[in-house]
């Protein structure tokens, strides 16, 4: 039995990194792994007005139902004026003892970071979710990068080639049948675009709605699940007629009911992606995907031949029109989306890769 500890600030939130760790922890076979997940609620930052998403009850329920032992600790502040982003007034070290574990699983940015820079004996498997920062810590035996682009950047920043492993984000996809919102919102005969995003102004992109404004007709609609309030303001300013906004949620059934409603996933994010959970979820429904260029370009690798990545809203609008009016192109993108999900992103494939890594580092 391998004893593994997951550690994450705000670890039961519905952000992408948090959901990755929650899914790995939940889906590991419990006849082979004893899984403890250390987490705290969101806390204010010192040195930034950024607000981390807080604990979501549905994510707590999900991991508990799958045999994960949740261990909650307290943090009063996260001090990002310190290079290691220290946790201030925390009882973490009262509840966590590294000698109790065979492996530590992280989900972090890449630079030396609290509390992992103080865990120096137990083997660490890092999951890195930003790019351009690398740390070669002696007991960090494997570093999981979530896209080829990110892996290349991590190695270029000084990361060890031997430690680097590319594994996409693991996602649990519920079976909800054909349940969708079309009848509820009287959208039965419309061609529907949509975007799912956390409520965060820092990642708001104006491009999807700017593009949709160019092509909107009485026979189209755009549905936003979650997302920054800036989207709602933008939709109002543009005078969009068929724009629907659904509240942020961590409940998988609602997310996938939303995705069942769409014809095309209209992705946008100001800083780009490494490996987007939202795009993977969309592909699990065989949805074609449109996106745009950004500083990080993991979305290009993800989408592949399941859609297009363009530079601005005018080109984005042209692809929207092609999706609507070129049936052969649209069907090809749907087929390719499903194939990419089955071949690359299916949960069972991803979890098996993590199992192999954990067994490897324990045997070192």
Regions found by a protein language model. Name each.
Residues 85-88, 106-111, 128:
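Short His-centered aromatic/hydrophobic patch
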Residues 140-176:
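Donor nucleotide-sugar binding/catalytic pocket of nucleotide-sugar-dependent glycosyltransferases
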Residues 304-314, 322-327:
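Conserved acidic donor-binding segment of nucleotide-sugar-dependent glycosyltransferases
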Residues 325-359:
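A charged, aromatic-enriched C-terminal amphipathic alpha-helix characteristic of glycosyltransferases
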Residues 8-14, 30-83, 227-231:
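N-terminal strand-loop element at the rim of the active site
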Residues 232-250:
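Nucleotide-activated donor-binding/catalytic signature segment of Leloir-type glycosyltransferases, i.e.
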């Amino acid at each position: 039995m391998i004893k593994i500890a997951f550690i994450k600030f705000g670890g039961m939130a519905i952000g992408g990194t948090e959901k990755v760790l929650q899914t790995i922890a939940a889906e590991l076979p419990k006849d082979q792994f004893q899984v403890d997940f250390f987490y705290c609620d969101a806390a204010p930052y010192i040195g930034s007005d950024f607000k981390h998403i807080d604990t979501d009850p549905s994510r707590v329920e999900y991991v508990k139902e799958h045999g994960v032992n949740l261990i909650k600790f307290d943090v009063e502040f996260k001090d990002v004026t310190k290079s290691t982003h220290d946790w201030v007034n925390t009882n973490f070290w009262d509840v966590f003892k590294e000698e109790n574990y065979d492996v530590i699983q992280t989900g972090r940015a890449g630079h030396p970071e609290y509390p992992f820079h103080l865990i120096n004996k137990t083997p660490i498997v890092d999951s890195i979710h930003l790019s351009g920062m690398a740390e070669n810590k002696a007991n960090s035996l494997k570093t999981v990068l979530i896209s080829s682009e990110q892996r290349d950047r991590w190695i270029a920043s000084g990361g060890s080639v031997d430690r680097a492993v590319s594994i996409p984000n693991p996602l649990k996809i519920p079976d909800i049948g054909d349940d969708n919102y079309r009848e509820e919102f009287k959208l039965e005969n419309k061609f529907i675009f949509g975007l799912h995003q956390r409520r965060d102004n820092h990642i708001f992109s104006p491009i999807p709605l700017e593009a949709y404004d160019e092509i909107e007709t009485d026979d189209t609609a755009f549905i936003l699940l979650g997302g920054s309030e800036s989207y709602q303001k933008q939709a109002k300013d543009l005078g969009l007629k068929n724009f629907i906004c659904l509240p942020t949620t961590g409940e998988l059934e609602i997310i996938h009911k939303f995705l069942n409603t769409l014809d095309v996933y209209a992705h946008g994010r100001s800083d780009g992606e490494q490996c987007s959970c939202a795009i993977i979820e969309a592909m699990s429904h065989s949805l074609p995907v449109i996106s745009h260029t950004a500083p990080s370009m993991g979305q290009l690798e993800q989408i592949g031949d399941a859609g297009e990545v363009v530079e601005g809203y005018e080109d984005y609008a042209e692809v929207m029109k092609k999706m609507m009016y070129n049936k052969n192109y649209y069907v090809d993108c749907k087929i390719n989306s499903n194939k990419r999900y089955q071949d690359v992103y299916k949960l069972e494939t991803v979890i098996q890769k993590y199992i192999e890594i954990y067994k490897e580092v324990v045997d070192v």
